[in-house]
Amino acid sequence: MTRRNKAQRNLKTDARMTPYDVKVKGTFAEPPKKEKLPPRKPTSEEQRANNLAPVEFSRESASVGNWIPLFRKELAEMNSGKVGRPYSFCDSMIIWIISLQTLIKGTYRTAAGLAAAILEDHGMKAPSYSRLFERSAEMLDRMLSENGGTYIIRAGSNIIDSPRNVGIDSSGFNLSNTCLWRKEKWGTGPKRRGWLKLHVLSDVDTGEVIAFAVTDKNTGDSPLMIPLLDAAVAAGHRIGIVYADGAYSSAENFDHVCGRLGTRFVTSFKVNTKPVNGGSRYRGEATRLWCSMPYAEWVEKSGYGRRWKSECGFSDVKRLFGESIHAFTMKGAVRKLLMKTETFSRYKEQRAILLSGCLASS
């Protein structure tokens, strides 16, 4: 490109500038640079809860004496008034067995053998491998039918009286059985089978999972925000401030959070965002604040720095239960990711209880 063409291009770019692009100093506004802020270290109470949570969660999961009364009560309710052969296994028993499988990173056959050894010692019949597989598949089909077969949305039962400040984010889980050594030595690896996407609405204070959705990799982030919030509210959760990254900064999400739910929505924007409404007056107020100050100052004033907790959840679930999903069929992969998330949700609930105890004793 010649010097003359460059000058003409710069002139056209300046001509497209609007009055909103001019700062108080009288110069053209530069996009707010997203500075890298220093990482926040966990407090002593949080570190203690992090250390105790795996021990207490494993103990609670393996303590079958706490689960047997629940199994018997649910079986009695299922068989009440039933004509014909009575039920032998309740849904909570199937979920408990698959949770053990997720916890030990085993197979269905391993979980069936472990359940047989535990339940038969307490006078209860354990499901076989084939029955365990069939019942888990039936539960997945039931969840898929609730949303038209496109995705799964689940809301947590960890309801409290006070509003929760929540963050939303998504991450992918690998469906390929990758082998890094084969790639390192021979320069080849298995064919990619794709990804599953997990969308999580979590409590930024405790890390608990409030609601989550499982979709394919092509599903966008922004369209899942409203269904996740609606699922959480329908389950009885009270929503406080909602934190999200720039992928969720649509006018529809602003109208839903600020208008319908009546709460604050804190999200970032693209660096070239202009302070205009863009279809929502709530979004216009947020963009004007975004463009009026440097990034570090905006983070401090808006409270956006709390959003990082929603990303930590994905790091935790992949570290505890693995990032890859080993299954032959897509339904099997969805079922395994679903149980990973359900088990992780119970783990975070246990951590929240420990954290509240640590804070109370300090």
What are these regions (language model features)?
Residues M1-Y20, F28-S44, R306:
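Short Lys/Arg-rich cationic patches that frequently serve as NLS/NoLS or arginine-rich RNA/DNA-binding motifs
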